[in-house]
């Protein structure tokens, strides 16, 4: 299954459908249609998961995979590596994109660039939008030798010819390619996982196994390094893999410093994949939240220059996956906002000018970024119920909840 097909991790087609059908009558018709879709989908998923329990690689099998990302080796006389975090302007997963960029930038161990397939606005899923620092064309002009590391987040068009061609050229120049979450689809479609060990988002693994049979798909690891290719599980695995990259580039002490700032105790790849699976309860939560369109609401997040984009990404991502709420950024003006680590954020709305949100979150405090995610999940549980918070943690593949 390609990332462009309907699944719970692709752009929120369900919520977008409701926005496009204005009348209650039309919305009710869509709701009943969704009931059938979810019922069919749940049967398919449960069947796939039963197969996984029988045929999926176990912990013992995963032990033979490299535990550490190979240490950085300088090329082209560079004093530190060039890292390209590349997304598709049409739609790219928010946290997959922002966290690797921000963690590596914060570490001051690499020259990191947020780039897009072109120079226009990049829509981030499930919320927010930015203007990339470079397009792939301008990046190539600036660094004709290529990047040392290329981070590939989940994108809506995982078979984009432009993205696949560019990724292959970077790999041919010696770049290490990191597929984060469903960014693994892009890496696999580029042919870079042939004969490799890899992992991926729990919901996608069965489909990845079926389509890419020449790849050894491994469970129970949040990230896997095999030669010059690294792959991860779902969204929140962007945190440990980014810290592992910092360690590979600048050493464990530097990685530990950044980890403490984020509120992370370690970045070990060990993982219990069996915890993450779609259940009847999960399907019921999705369905009941989706059809309760009268209680859908917007969550306003105030942003200003210097905003912590890691906290912003984690909070906006979580609130926009409840199937009850959508995060929207508010600023004092429509001007582009430069975040703490240099991303160019484009506000969704302007205070006092545009429609207000149903709820406005308080400003971020000084708590570490991962603490902000924990607090957000607790808030989601209070507002929408614990089952909704558990579903959000499931989709984020967040083991700490």
Which residue ranges define each predicted feature?
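Conserved Rossmann-fold dehydrogenase catalytic segment
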Residues: 217-230, 263-264
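Loop-centered beta-sheet repeat module
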Residues: 226-229, 234-246
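Glycine- and other small-residue-rich loops at beta-strand/loop junctions that grip anionic moieties
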Residues: 89, 197, 227, 231-234, ...
């Amino acid at each position: 299954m390609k990332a462009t097909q309907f699944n719970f991790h692709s752009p929120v087609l369900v919520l977008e459908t409701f926005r496009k059908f204005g009348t209650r009558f039309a919305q009710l018709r869509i709701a009943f249609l969704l009931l059938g879709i979810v019922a069919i989908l749940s049967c398919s998923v449960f069947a796939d998961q039963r197969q996984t329990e029988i045929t999926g690689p176990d912990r013992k099998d995963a032990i033979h995979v490299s535990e550490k990302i190979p240490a950085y080796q300088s090329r082209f006389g560079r004093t530190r590596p060039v890292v390209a975090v590349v997304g598709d302007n049409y739609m790219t997963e928010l946290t997959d994109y922002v966290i690797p960029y921000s963690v590596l930038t914060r570490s001051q161990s690499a020259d990191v660039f947020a780039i897009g397939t072109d120079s226009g606005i990049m829509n981030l899923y499930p919320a927010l939008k930015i203007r990339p620092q470079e397009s792939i064309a301008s990046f190539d002009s600036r660094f004709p030798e290529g990047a040392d590391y290329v981070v590939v987040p989940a994108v809506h068009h995982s078979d984009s010819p432009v993205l696949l061609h560019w990724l292959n050229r970077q790999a041919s120049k010696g770049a290490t390619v990191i597929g984060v979450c469903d960014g693994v689809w892009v890496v696999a479609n580029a042919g870079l996982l042939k004969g490799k060990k890899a992992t991926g988002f729990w919901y996608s693994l069965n489909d990845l196994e079926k389509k890419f049979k020449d790849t050894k798909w491994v469970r129970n690891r949040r990230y896997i390094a095999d030669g010059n290719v690294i792959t991860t599980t779902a969204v929140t695995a962007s945190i440990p893999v980014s810290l592992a990259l910092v360690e590979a580039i600048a050493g464990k002490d530097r990685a530990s410093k950044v980890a403490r700032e984020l509120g992370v105790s370690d970045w070990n790849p060990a993982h219990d994949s069996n915890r993450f699976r779609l259940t009847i309860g999960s399907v019921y939560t999705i369905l009941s939240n989706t059809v309760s369109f009268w209680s859908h609401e917007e969550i306003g997040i105030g942003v200003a220059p210097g905003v912590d984009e890691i906290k912003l990404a984690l909070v906006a991502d979580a609130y926009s996956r409840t199937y009850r709420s959508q995060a929207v950024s508010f600023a004092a003006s429509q001007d582009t906002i430069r975040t703490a680590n240099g991303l160019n954020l484009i506000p969704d709305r302007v205070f006092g000018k545009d429609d207000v949100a149903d709820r406005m979150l308080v400003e971020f405090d000084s708590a570490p970024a991962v603490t902000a995610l924990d607090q957000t999940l607790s808030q989601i549980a209070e507002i929408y119920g614990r089952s909704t918070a558990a579903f959000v943690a499931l989709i984020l593949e967040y083991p700490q909840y």
